[in-house]
């Protein structure tokens, strides 16, 4: 690299009189720089011949590959819309030929039908399985309802009579409920309420304790009735 810089500053020019392809090698610190100058016409002619040979071999390989293609792709190659079927003239690697599926390269053909497996639509809800769909499961009921509509339209008087009968029935039921509600206070008597309340209170634990205390106080007062000063008995429980 330093030699190259020195040559640029000093102005040394290397000229070669031979017509062979020129190679300029520069060694510096174990680095080799090779500059290939493609100015030889003989070498370019040789390259063109090699390219032609490679093109013939690749065309032969392509014909063999196209002969192995399925019938669907062969019919596609015959179509006028060849925008999707222009393959580059490159050698095949390991006899693999990668093409898009037929549905993308059909080019408007209607003869090719893309087959779909029934397992593809398992996650798609079928209209018969829809929750929001309204199914007519009873055609007999619908026919009967249509017949009833025709009959009702022919007889409006029957509708009016049926409505009046329903209204009267509702009024009678409401009056019967009101009568039973009014009869309940008459059957309820205060003596029965007092008796039941006293029984419930007497069976209570606190009520029994109060009765015992009142009895004890009354007996003590009877014992000390001869004294002049009457003092109240001490309260055992703070109620």
From Swiss-Prot:
Induction: By adriamycin, methymethane sulfonate, ethanol, H(2)O(2), ultraviolet irradiation and heat shock. Rapidly induced in acinar cells of the pancreas with acute pancreatitis upon caerulein treatment.
GO molecular function, a single term: antioxidant activity
GO biological process terms on file: apoptotic process; autophagic cell death; autophagy; cellular response to ethanol; cellular response to hydroperoxide; cellular response to methyl methanesulfonate; cellular response to UV; negative regulation of cell migration
Superkingdom assignment: Eukaryota
Motif placement: LIR: 25-37
One Pfam family here: DOR
Coiled-coil zones: none
Subcellular location field: Cytoplasm, Cytosol; Nucleus; Nucleus, PML body; Cytoplasmic vesicle, Autophagosome
GO cellular component, one term: cytosol
Tissue: Ubiquitously expressed with highest levels in the thymus.
Function noted in UniProt: Antiproliferative and proapoptotic protein involved in cell stress response which acts as a dual regulator of transcription and autophagy. Acts as a positive regulator of autophagy. In response to cellular stress or activation of autophagy, relocates to autophagosomes where it interacts with autophagosome-associated proteins GABARAP, GABARAPL1/L2, MAP1LC3A/B/C and regulates autophagy. Acts as an antioxidant and plays a major role in p53/TP53-driven oxidative stress response.
Domain characteristics, as noted in the entry: The LC3 interacting region (LIR) motif mediates interaction with GABARAP, GABARAPL1, GABARAPL2, MAP1LC3A, MAP1LC3B and MAP1LC3C.
Subunit (UniProt): Interacts with p53/TP53 and HIPK2. Interacts with PRKCG, GABARAP, GABARAPL1, GABARAPL2, MAP1LC3A, MAP1LC3B and MAP1LC3C.
Name of the protein described by the UniProt record: Tumor protein p53-inducible nuclear protein 1
Organism per entry: Mus musculus
């Amino acid at each position: 690299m330093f030699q190259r810089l020195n040559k640029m500053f000093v102005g040394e020019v290397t000229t070669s009189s031979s017509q062979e392809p020129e190679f300029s090698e520069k060694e510096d610190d174990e680095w080799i720089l090779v500059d290939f100058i493609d100015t030889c016409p003989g070498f370019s002619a040789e390259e063109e011949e090699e390219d032609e040979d490679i093109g013939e071999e690749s065309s032969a390989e392509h014909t063999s590959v196209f002969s192995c293609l399925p019938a669907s792709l062969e019919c596609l190659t015959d179509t006028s819309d060849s925008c999707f079927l222009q393959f580059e003239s490159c050698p095949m690697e390991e006899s693999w030929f990668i093409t898009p599926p037929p549905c993308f390269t059909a080019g408007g053909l209607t003869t090719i039908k893309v087959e779909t497996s029934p397992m593809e639509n398992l996650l798609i809800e079928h209209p018969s399985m829809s929750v929001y769909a309204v199914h007519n499961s009873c055609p007999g009921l619908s026919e009967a309802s249509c017949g009833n509509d025709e009959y009702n339209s022919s007889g409006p008087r029957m509708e009016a009579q049926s409505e009046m009968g329903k209204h009267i029935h509702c009024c009678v039921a409401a009056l019967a409920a009101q009568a039973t509600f009014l009869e309940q206070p008459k059957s309820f008597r205060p003596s029965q309420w007092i008796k039941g309340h006293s029984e419930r209170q007497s069976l209570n634990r606190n009520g029994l304790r109060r009765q015992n205390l009142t009895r004890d106080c009354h007996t003590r007062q009877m014992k000390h009735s001869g004294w002049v000063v009457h003092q109240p008995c001490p309260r055992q429980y703070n109620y």
